Protein backbone atom coordinates (compact mmCIF):
# COMPACT_ATOMS: atom_id res chain seq x y z
CA UNK A 1 0.00 0.00 0.00
CA UNK A 2 1.39 3.40 -0.91
CA UNK A 3 1.84 5.73 2.04
CA UNK A 4 0.62 9.33 2.14
CA UNK A 5 3.18 11.83 0.94
CA UNK A 6 4.73 14.13 3.54
CA UNK A 7 3.52 17.14 1.59
CA UNK A 8 -0.10 16.24 2.36
CA UNK A 9 0.31 16.43 6.10
CA UNK A 10 -2.03 18.73 7.98
CA UNK A 11 0.67 19.02 10.61
CA UNK A 12 3.50 16.81 11.83
CA UNK A 13 6.10 18.75 13.73
CA UNK A 14 7.53 19.45 17.16
CA UNK A 15 5.38 21.76 19.20
CA UNK A 16 7.99 24.54 19.09
CA UNK A 17 7.42 24.87 15.34
CA UNK A 18 3.70 24.11 15.18
CA UNK A 19 1.61 27.01 13.86
CA UNK A 20 -2.08 26.51 14.60
CA UNK A 21 -4.60 27.90 12.13
CA UNK A 22 -7.60 29.70 13.54
CA UNK A 23 -10.90 30.16 11.74
CA UNK A 24 -12.43 33.57 11.50
CA UNK A 25 -15.31 32.51 13.72
CA UNK A 26 -12.90 31.80 16.59
CA UNK A 27 -10.57 34.74 16.09
CA UNK A 28 -12.40 37.12 18.33
CA UNK A 29 -10.76 35.92 21.54
CA UNK A 30 -10.40 32.97 23.85
CA UNK A 31 -13.95 32.87 25.20
CA UNK A 32 -16.69 30.38 24.50
CA UNK A 33 -17.67 30.16 20.85
CA UNK A 34 -21.09 28.77 19.84
CA UNK A 35 -20.52 25.55 17.91
CA UNK A 36 -23.54 26.20 15.70
CA UNK A 37 -21.93 29.38 14.39
CA UNK A 38 -18.64 27.62 13.70
CA UNK A 39 -20.25 24.75 11.83
CA UNK A 40 -22.44 27.09 9.78
CA UNK A 41 -19.42 29.18 8.80
CA UNK A 42 -17.35 26.14 7.84
CA UNK A 43 -20.18 24.63 5.84
CA UNK A 44 -20.26 27.80 3.76
CA UNK A 45 -16.48 27.84 3.38
CA UNK A 46 -16.38 24.38 1.73
CA UNK A 47 -12.60 24.20 1.89
CA UNK A 48 -10.84 21.06 0.61
CA UNK A 49 -10.00 18.36 3.09
CA UNK A 50 -6.83 18.93 5.09
CA UNK A 51 -7.09 22.73 4.94
CA UNK A 52 -7.23 24.25 8.38
CA UNK A 53 -8.38 22.18 11.35
CA UNK A 54 -11.30 20.24 9.92
CA UNK A 55 -12.40 17.57 7.48
CA UNK A 56 -15.35 18.28 5.22
CA UNK A 57 -18.16 15.80 5.73
CA UNK A 58 -19.22 13.94 2.61
CA UNK A 59 -20.75 10.73 1.36
CA UNK A 60 -18.44 7.79 0.79
CA UNK A 61 -19.06 4.50 -0.96
CA UNK A 62 -17.98 1.53 1.14
CA UNK A 63 -17.15 -0.50 -1.95
CA UNK A 64 -16.94 -3.50 0.29
CA UNK A 65 -18.42 -6.03 -2.04
CA UNK A 66 -20.87 -7.17 0.61
CA UNK A 67 -20.55 -7.72 4.31
CA UNK A 68 -21.41 -5.32 7.08
CA UNK A 69 -24.29 -2.95 7.52
CA UNK A 70 -22.53 -0.34 5.39
CA UNK A 71 -21.51 -2.63 2.53
CA UNK A 72 -22.34 -1.15 -0.87
CA UNK A 73 -24.22 1.81 0.63
CA UNK A 74 -23.30 5.45 0.96
CA UNK A 75 -22.81 6.80 4.47
CA UNK A 76 -22.08 10.16 6.02
CA UNK A 77 -18.65 10.77 7.48
CA UNK A 78 -18.36 12.90 10.61
CA UNK A 79 -16.93 16.39 10.53
CA UNK A 80 -13.59 16.39 12.34
CA UNK A 81 -12.38 19.47 14.19
CA UNK A 82 -9.11 19.30 16.07
CA UNK A 83 -6.75 21.44 18.09
CA UNK A 84 -3.31 20.92 19.62
CA UNK A 85 -1.55 22.76 22.42
CA UNK A 86 1.78 22.14 24.15
CA UNK A 87 4.29 23.51 26.63
CA UNK A 88 7.88 22.30 26.56
CA UNK A 89 10.11 21.47 29.52
CA UNK A 90 12.59 18.95 28.07
CA UNK A 91 11.83 19.14 24.35
CA UNK A 92 10.93 15.44 24.12
CA UNK A 93 7.18 15.58 23.33
CA UNK A 94 6.15 15.26 19.67
CA UNK A 95 2.85 14.80 17.90
CA UNK A 96 1.37 13.88 14.53
CA UNK A 97 -1.73 15.38 12.90
CA UNK A 98 -2.76 13.97 9.48
CA UNK A 99 -6.26 14.33 8.10
CA UNK A 100 -5.88 13.15 4.51
CA UNK A 101 -4.30 9.69 4.66
CA UNK A 102 -5.47 7.49 1.78
CA UNK A 103 -6.32 3.82 1.77
CA UNK A 104 -6.57 2.12 -1.65
CA UNK A 105 -9.92 1.21 -3.13
CA UNK A 106 -10.89 -2.44 -3.46
CA UNK A 107 -9.49 -4.36 -6.40
CA UNK A 108 -13.05 -4.96 -7.61
CA UNK A 109 -13.64 -1.26 -8.16
CA UNK A 110 -13.66 -0.23 -11.80
CA UNK A 111 -11.51 2.59 -13.12
CA UNK A 112 -14.61 4.61 -14.00
CA UNK A 113 -15.99 4.40 -10.49
CA UNK A 114 -12.60 5.37 -9.06
CA UNK A 115 -12.55 8.47 -11.23
CA UNK A 116 -15.96 9.63 -10.02
CA UNK A 117 -15.77 8.60 -6.35
CA UNK A 118 -14.09 10.55 -3.55
CA UNK A 119 -10.87 9.03 -2.20
CA UNK A 120 -11.04 6.56 0.68
CA UNK A 121 -9.41 8.53 3.47
CA UNK A 122 -8.75 8.36 7.18
CA UNK A 123 -7.18 10.63 9.79
CA UNK A 124 -4.28 9.97 12.15
CA UNK A 125 -3.50 11.70 15.44
CA UNK A 126 -0.60 10.69 17.68
CA UNK A 127 1.25 11.79 20.81
CA UNK A 128 4.84 10.64 21.39
CA UNK A 129 6.48 11.35 24.75
CA UNK A 130 10.21 10.70 24.50
CA UNK A 131 12.67 9.98 27.29
CA UNK A 132 16.46 9.87 27.45
CA UNK A 133 16.49 12.11 24.39
CA UNK A 134 14.09 12.81 21.54
CA UNK A 135 15.46 10.54 18.77
CA UNK A 136 12.98 7.69 19.34
CA UNK A 137 10.00 10.05 19.38
CA UNK A 138 11.09 11.74 16.15
CA UNK A 139 11.75 8.43 14.39
CA UNK A 140 8.40 7.03 15.50
CA UNK A 141 6.54 10.14 14.38
CA UNK A 142 8.15 9.95 10.94
CA UNK A 143 7.93 6.19 10.32
CA UNK A 144 5.21 4.44 12.33
CA UNK A 145 2.34 5.21 9.95
CA UNK A 146 4.24 3.91 6.93
CA UNK A 147 5.14 0.71 8.80
CA UNK A 148 1.50 0.14 9.77
CA UNK A 149 0.31 0.64 6.19
CA UNK A 150 2.99 -1.66 4.79
CA UNK A 151 1.59 -4.46 6.96
CA UNK A 152 -1.92 -4.09 5.52
CA UNK A 153 -2.98 -6.54 2.77
CA UNK A 154 -4.04 -4.98 -0.52
CA UNK A 155 -7.45 -4.98 -2.16
CA UNK A 156 -9.53 -4.90 1.03
CA UNK A 157 -12.99 -3.46 1.44
CA UNK A 158 -13.41 -0.81 4.11
CA UNK A 159 -14.85 -3.35 6.54
CA UNK A 160 -11.98 -5.76 5.88
CA UNK A 161 -9.46 -2.93 6.19
CA UNK A 162 -10.78 -1.98 9.62
CA UNK A 163 -10.78 -5.64 10.66
CA UNK A 164 -7.11 -6.02 9.64
CA UNK A 165 -6.01 -2.76 11.25
CA UNK A 166 -5.35 -4.02 14.84
CA UNK A 167 -2.96 -6.69 13.57
CA UNK A 168 -1.20 -4.22 11.26
CA UNK A 169 -0.76 -1.81 14.17
CA UNK A 170 1.01 -4.51 16.19
CA UNK A 171 3.33 -5.28 13.26
CA UNK A 172 3.97 -1.57 12.66
CA UNK A 173 4.87 -0.87 16.29
CA UNK A 174 7.27 -3.83 16.49
CA UNK A 175 8.91 -2.96 13.17
CA UNK A 176 9.38 0.67 14.24
CA UNK A 177 11.02 -0.46 17.48
CA UNK A 178 13.24 -3.00 15.71
CA UNK A 179 14.46 -0.54 13.07
CA UNK A 180 15.09 2.24 15.57
CA UNK A 181 17.13 -0.09 17.77
CA UNK A 182 19.30 -0.86 14.74
CA UNK A 183 20.47 2.76 14.97
CA UNK A 184 22.04 2.05 18.35
CA UNK A 185 20.56 5.13 20.01
CA UNK A 186 19.41 4.74 23.60
CA UNK A 187 16.33 6.94 23.76
CA UNK A 188 12.79 5.64 23.98
CA UNK A 189 9.26 6.92 23.60
CA UNK A 190 5.65 6.30 24.41
CA UNK A 191 3.28 6.18 21.45
CA UNK A 192 -0.47 6.68 21.36
CA UNK A 193 -1.62 6.32 17.77
CA UNK A 194 -5.24 7.08 16.84
CA UNK A 195 -6.77 6.24 13.45
CA UNK A 196 -10.23 7.62 12.63
CA UNK A 197 -12.05 6.16 9.62
CA UNK A 198 -15.61 7.38 9.44
CA UNK A 199 -17.17 6.78 12.85
CA UNK A 200 -14.66 4.04 13.73
CA UNK A 201 -11.81 4.87 16.10
CA UNK A 202 -8.80 2.55 16.45
CA UNK A 203 -6.25 3.34 19.16
CA UNK A 204 -2.89 1.60 19.66
CA UNK A 205 -0.65 2.58 22.55
CA UNK A 206 2.49 1.78 24.51
CA UNK A 207 3.47 3.76 27.58
CA UNK A 208 1.35 6.25 29.48
CA UNK A 209 0.18 8.84 26.92
CA UNK A 210 -3.52 8.36 27.48
CA UNK A 211 -6.46 8.71 25.08
CA UNK A 212 -9.97 9.24 26.44
CA UNK A 213 -13.39 9.50 24.81
CA UNK A 214 -15.85 12.08 26.11
CA UNK A 215 -19.18 11.03 24.63
CA UNK A 216 -22.32 13.14 24.49
CA UNK A 217 -24.03 13.01 27.88
CA UNK A 218 -20.84 13.14 29.93
CA UNK A 219 -19.62 9.53 29.66
CA UNK A 220 -15.81 9.50 29.92
CA UNK A 221 -14.11 6.27 28.87
CA UNK A 222 -10.50 5.17 28.49
CA UNK A 223 -9.33 3.98 25.09
CA UNK A 224 -5.82 3.13 26.32
CA UNK A 225 -4.18 1.26 29.19
CA UNK A 226 -1.34 2.86 31.14
CA UNK A 227 1.82 0.72 31.02
CA UNK A 228 3.26 2.13 34.22
CA UNK A 229 4.77 -0.47 36.51
CA UNK A 230 3.48 1.41 39.55
CA UNK A 231 -0.17 0.94 38.59
CA UNK A 232 -0.26 -2.07 36.26
CA UNK A 233 -0.03 -5.34 38.19
CA UNK A 234 -0.34 -7.53 35.08
CA UNK A 235 2.63 -5.80 33.48
CA UNK A 236 4.75 -6.17 36.63
CA UNK A 237 4.06 -9.90 36.61
CA UNK A 238 4.89 -10.16 32.91
CA UNK A 239 8.21 -8.33 33.30
CA UNK A 240 9.35 -10.44 36.24
CA UNK A 241 8.27 -13.66 34.49
CA UNK A 242 10.39 -12.61 31.48
CA UNK A 243 13.51 -12.13 33.59
CA UNK A 244 13.31 -8.49 34.61
CA UNK A 245 13.46 -7.09 38.13
CA UNK A 246 10.94 -4.57 39.42
CA UNK A 247 11.77 -2.30 42.35
CA UNK A 248 12.27 1.25 43.52
CA UNK A 249 15.46 3.27 43.40
CA UNK A 250 17.71 2.47 46.37
CA UNK A 251 19.62 5.26 48.10
CA UNK A 252 22.31 5.34 50.75
CA UNK A 253 21.14 3.50 53.83
CA UNK A 254 18.96 1.06 51.92
CA UNK A 255 15.89 3.26 51.65
CA UNK A 256 13.78 2.95 48.50
CA UNK A 257 12.32 6.02 46.83
CA UNK A 258 10.28 6.96 43.79
CA UNK A 259 8.00 4.88 41.56
CA UNK A 260 8.50 1.24 40.67
CA UNK A 261 11.08 0.75 37.93
CA UNK A 262 12.33 -2.09 35.77
CA UNK A 263 15.95 -3.15 36.12
CA UNK A 264 18.31 -3.05 34.34
CA UNK A 265 17.63 0.42 33.01
CA UNK A 266 15.40 1.97 35.66
CA UNK A 267 12.47 2.63 33.31
CA UNK A 268 9.07 3.29 34.90
CA UNK A 269 7.23 1.89 31.87
CA UNK A 270 6.78 -1.73 30.82
CA UNK A 271 6.14 -0.97 27.13
CA UNK A 272 7.77 1.56 24.82
CA UNK A 273 9.49 2.01 21.47
CA UNK A 274 13.28 2.15 21.58
CA UNK A 275 15.09 1.83 24.93
CA UNK A 276 17.82 -0.44 23.59
CA UNK A 277 19.75 -0.14 26.87
CA UNK A 278 16.86 -1.67 28.83
CA UNK A 279 15.90 -5.36 28.89
CA UNK A 280 13.97 -6.81 25.96
CA UNK A 281 11.04 -7.44 28.29
CA UNK A 282 10.22 -3.75 27.77
CA UNK A 283 8.18 -4.50 24.66
CA UNK A 284 6.72 -2.39 21.82
CA UNK A 285 3.58 -4.55 21.45
CA UNK A 286 0.66 -2.11 21.79
CA UNK A 287 -2.64 -2.34 23.57
CA UNK A 288 -5.25 -1.88 20.81
CA UNK A 289 -8.88 -0.86 21.14
CA UNK A 290 -11.36 -0.25 18.33
CA UNK A 291 -14.77 1.33 18.85
CA UNK A 292 -17.50 2.76 16.66
CA UNK A 293 -19.34 5.90 17.72
CA UNK A 294 -23.00 6.52 17.14
CA UNK A 295 -23.92 9.55 15.05
CA UNK A 296 -24.26 11.52 18.28
CA UNK A 297 -20.52 12.10 18.00
CA UNK A 298 -17.96 12.64 20.73
CA UNK A 299 -14.63 14.15 21.71
CA UNK A 300 -11.19 12.52 21.92
CA UNK A 301 -8.48 13.88 24.22
CA UNK A 302 -5.00 12.50 23.52
CA UNK A 303 -2.23 13.74 25.79
CA UNK A 304 1.18 13.03 27.30
CA UNK A 305 1.66 12.32 30.99
CA UNK A 306 2.34 15.99 31.62
CA UNK A 307 -1.46 16.27 31.46
CA UNK A 308 -2.42 13.02 33.20
CA UNK A 309 -0.04 13.50 36.14
CA UNK A 310 -1.97 16.68 36.90
CA UNK A 311 -5.55 15.86 35.86
CA UNK A 312 -7.79 12.82 36.02
CA UNK A 313 -9.57 11.74 32.86
CA UNK A 314 -12.83 13.18 34.16
CA UNK A 315 -11.20 16.48 35.15
CA UNK A 316 -9.56 16.89 31.75
CA UNK A 317 -12.83 16.24 29.94
CA UNK A 318 -14.85 18.50 32.23
CA UNK A 319 -12.52 21.50 32.12
CA UNK A 320 -12.87 21.96 28.35
CA UNK A 321 -16.53 21.10 27.72
CA UNK A 322 -18.34 23.77 25.75
CA UNK A 323 -15.16 24.93 23.99
CA UNK A 324 -14.28 24.28 20.33
CA UNK A 325 -11.43 21.82 19.84
CA UNK A 326 -8.58 24.30 19.43
CA UNK A 327 -9.51 26.27 22.54
CA UNK A 328 -10.26 23.03 24.39
CA UNK A 329 -6.70 21.76 23.88
CA UNK A 330 -5.30 25.03 25.20
CA UNK A 331 -7.64 24.91 28.19
CA UNK A 332 -6.57 21.37 29.15
CA UNK A 333 -2.90 22.39 29.07
CA UNK A 334 -3.69 25.56 31.03
CA UNK A 335 -5.56 23.59 33.69
CA UNK A 336 -2.72 21.06 34.02
CA UNK A 337 -0.16 23.84 34.45
CA UNK A 338 -2.39 25.60 36.99
CA UNK A 339 -2.72 22.38 38.99
CA UNK A 340 0.87 21.12 38.93
CA UNK A 341 3.09 23.64 37.19
CA UNK A 342 5.39 22.91 34.25
CA UNK A 343 7.29 19.87 35.56
CA UNK A 344 7.31 17.88 32.32
CA UNK A 345 6.63 18.30 28.61
CA UNK A 346 2.88 18.78 28.30
CA UNK A 347 1.03 18.06 25.05
CA UNK A 348 -2.69 17.74 24.33
CA UNK A 349 -4.68 17.00 21.16
CA UNK A 350 -8.46 17.39 21.12
CA UNK A 351 -10.49 15.90 18.26
CA UNK A 352 -14.24 16.47 17.90
CA UNK A 353 -16.28 14.05 15.77
CA UNK A 354 -19.41 15.96 14.77
CA UNK A 355 -22.45 14.74 12.77
CA UNK A 356 -22.24 16.45 9.36
CA UNK A 357 -25.90 17.27 8.85
CA UNK A 358 -27.05 18.69 12.16
CA UNK A 359 -26.08 21.31 14.70
CA UNK A 360 -24.49 19.58 17.67
CA UNK A 361 -23.19 21.10 20.89
CA UNK A 362 -19.73 20.28 22.17
CA UNK A 363 -19.77 17.68 24.96
CA UNK A 364 -21.59 19.34 27.82
CA UNK A 365 -21.55 18.58 31.55
CA UNK A 366 -23.76 15.61 32.51
CA UNK A 367 -26.97 15.99 34.42
CA UNK A 368 -26.90 15.64 38.20
CA UNK A 369 -28.27 12.12 37.94
CA UNK A 370 -26.37 10.26 35.29
CA UNK A 371 -25.49 6.59 35.67
CA UNK A 372 -23.08 6.88 32.75
CA UNK A 373 -21.00 9.64 34.33
CA UNK A 374 -17.76 7.66 34.66
CA UNK A 375 -17.87 4.73 32.31
CA UNK A 376 -14.40 3.24 32.03
CA UNK A 377 -13.53 0.53 29.51
CA UNK A 378 -11.74 -2.33 31.24
CA UNK A 379 -10.03 -5.39 29.84
CA UNK A 380 -12.59 -8.14 29.40
CA UNK A 381 -12.10 -11.44 31.24
CA UNK A 382 -14.15 -14.59 31.51
CA UNK A 383 -14.79 -14.01 35.21
CA UNK A 384 -15.52 -10.30 35.01
CA UNK A 385 -17.44 -9.35 31.86
CA UNK A 386 -17.20 -5.75 30.77
CA UNK A 387 -20.52 -4.55 32.13
CA UNK A 388 -19.59 -0.89 31.69
CA UNK A 389 -18.94 -1.38 27.99
CA UNK A 390 -22.28 -3.13 27.66
CA UNK A 391 -23.99 -0.21 29.41
CA UNK A 392 -22.39 2.31 27.09
CA UNK A 393 -23.26 0.18 24.06
CA UNK A 394 -26.83 -0.26 25.27
CA UNK A 395 -27.12 3.50 25.52
CA UNK A 396 -26.42 3.69 21.79
CA UNK A 397 -23.29 5.79 22.26
CA UNK A 398 -20.45 3.48 21.23
CA UNK A 399 -19.96 -0.06 19.99
CA UNK A 400 -16.83 -1.94 21.03
CA UNK A 401 -15.37 -3.76 18.02
CA UNK A 402 -11.99 -4.98 19.28
CA UNK A 403 -9.80 -4.97 22.39
CA UNK A 404 -6.53 -6.80 23.05
CA UNK A 405 -3.53 -6.06 25.22
CA UNK A 406 -1.46 -9.25 25.26
CA UNK A 407 2.29 -8.81 24.84
CA UNK A 408 2.60 -12.20 23.07
CA UNK A 409 3.14 -11.84 19.33
CA UNK A 410 1.71 -15.29 18.63
CA UNK A 411 -1.58 -14.11 20.13
CA UNK A 412 -1.54 -10.70 18.49
CA UNK A 413 -0.65 -11.77 14.95
CA UNK A 414 -3.18 -14.63 14.91
CA UNK A 415 -3.40 -17.32 12.24
CA UNK A 416 -2.80 -17.00 8.53
CA UNK A 417 -2.83 -20.22 6.56
CA UNK A 418 -1.96 -18.32 3.40
CA UNK A 419 1.24 -16.96 4.92
CA UNK A 420 0.73 -13.74 2.91
CA UNK A 421 2.44 -14.88 -0.27
CA UNK A 422 3.76 -12.26 -2.63
CA UNK A 423 3.18 -12.23 -6.38
CA UNK A 424 6.39 -14.25 -6.76
CA UNK A 425 5.01 -16.96 -4.40
CA UNK A 426 7.47 -15.96 -1.66
CA UNK A 427 6.32 -15.66 1.93
CA UNK A 428 6.44 -12.29 3.68
CA UNK A 429 7.64 -11.66 7.24
CA UNK A 430 4.61 -10.44 9.21
CA UNK A 431 6.73 -7.80 10.98
CA UNK A 432 9.40 -6.37 8.67
CA UNK A 433 7.70 -7.34 5.36
CA UNK A 434 10.85 -8.86 3.82
CA UNK A 435 10.32 -11.67 1.30
CA UNK A 436 11.10 -15.19 2.49
CA UNK A 437 11.60 -18.45 0.69
CA UNK A 438 9.21 -21.15 2.00
CA UNK A 439 12.15 -22.82 3.75
CA UNK A 440 13.20 -19.58 5.48
CA UNK A 441 9.98 -18.54 7.18
CA UNK A 442 9.49 -19.44 10.85
CA UNK A 443 5.89 -19.58 12.02
CA UNK A 444 5.05 -17.20 14.84
CA UNK A 445 3.43 -20.24 16.50
CA UNK A 446 6.51 -22.46 16.32
CA UNK A 447 7.31 -23.91 19.72
CA UNK A 448 3.67 -23.88 20.81
CA UNK A 449 2.65 -27.24 19.39
CA UNK A 450 1.76 -28.64 22.81
CA UNK A 451 -0.14 -25.59 23.99
CA UNK A 452 -3.87 -25.55 24.42
CA UNK A 453 -4.14 -23.03 21.60
CA UNK A 454 -5.72 -24.07 18.34
CA UNK A 455 -2.82 -22.39 16.50
CA UNK A 456 -0.76 -24.69 14.28
CA UNK A 457 3.00 -24.07 14.07
CA UNK A 458 3.05 -25.04 10.38
CA UNK A 459 0.64 -22.20 9.60
CA UNK A 460 1.44 -18.53 9.23
CA UNK A 461 1.97 -15.76 9.83
CA UNK A 462 5.70 -16.26 9.36
CA UNK A 463 8.67 -14.35 10.72
CA UNK A 464 12.19 -13.91 9.44
CA UNK A 465 14.93 -15.21 11.73
CA UNK A 466 15.71 -11.68 12.96
CA UNK A 467 12.12 -10.97 13.98
CA UNK A 468 11.80 -14.44 15.51
CA UNK A 469 14.86 -13.73 17.69
CA UNK A 470 13.26 -10.49 18.82
CA UNK A 471 9.99 -12.28 19.61
CA UNK A 472 11.85 -14.87 21.71
CA UNK A 473 13.70 -12.13 23.63
CA UNK A 474 10.50 -10.21 24.37
CA UNK A 475 8.92 -13.39 25.74
CA UNK A 476 11.93 -14.22 27.93
CA UNK A 477 13.05 -17.22 25.85
CA UNK A 478 16.67 -16.04 25.65
CA UNK A 479 18.84 -13.76 27.84
CA UNK A 480 17.63 -10.19 27.64
CA UNK A 481 21.18 -8.87 27.49
CA UNK A 482 21.67 -10.42 24.04
CA UNK A 483 20.43 -7.80 21.61
CA UNK A 484 19.40 -8.49 18.03
CA UNK A 485 20.83 -5.71 15.90
Curated annotation (Swiss-Prot):
Biased composition (Basic residues): 13-23
Note on cofactor: Binds 2 magnesium or manganese ions per subunit.
Keywords (A to Z) from UniProt: Hydrolase, Magnesium, Manganese, Metal-binding, Protein phosphatase
UniProt-annotated binding residues for Mn(2+) 1: 129-130
Enzyme Commission number(s) of this protein: 3.1.3.16
GO molecular function per UniProt: metal ion binding; protein serine/threonine phosphatase activity
InterPro entries: PP2C, PPM-type-like_dom_sf, PPM-type_phosphatase-like_dom
Composition bias type Low complexity, residue spans: 1-11
Record keyword Translocase present: no
Binding site for Mn(2+) 2: 129, 305, 344
Name under which the protein is recorded: Probable protein phosphatase 2C 3
A Pfam family: PP2C
Segments for region (Disordered): 1-29, 43-72
Catalytic activity: O-phospho-L-seryl-[protein] + H2O = L-seryl-[protein] + phosphate; O-phospho-L-threonyl-[protein] + H2O = L-threonyl-[protein] + phosphate
Biological processes annotated in GO: regulation of intracellular signal transduction
Coiled-coil segments: none
Organism: Oryza sativa subsp. japonica
Family according to the record: Belongs to the PP2C family.
Domain PPM-type phosphatase: 107-353
Enzyme class: hydrolase
Cofactor(s) for this UniProt protein: Mg(2+); Mn(2+)
Amino acid sequence: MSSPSPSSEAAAAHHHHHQRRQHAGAAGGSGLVPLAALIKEEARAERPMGSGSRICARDEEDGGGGGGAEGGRRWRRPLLRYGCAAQSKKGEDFFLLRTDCARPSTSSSSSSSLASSPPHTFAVFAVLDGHNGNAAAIYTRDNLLNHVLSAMPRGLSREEWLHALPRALVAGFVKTDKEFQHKGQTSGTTATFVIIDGWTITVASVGDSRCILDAQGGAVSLLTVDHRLEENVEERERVTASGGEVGRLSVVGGAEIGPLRCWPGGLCLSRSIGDIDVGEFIVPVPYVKQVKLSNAGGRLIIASDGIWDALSSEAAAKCCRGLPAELAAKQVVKEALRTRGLKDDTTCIVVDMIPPDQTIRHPSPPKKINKLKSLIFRKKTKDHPNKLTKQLSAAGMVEELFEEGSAMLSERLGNDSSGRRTSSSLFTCAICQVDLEPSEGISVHAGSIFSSSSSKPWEGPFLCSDCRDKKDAMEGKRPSGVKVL
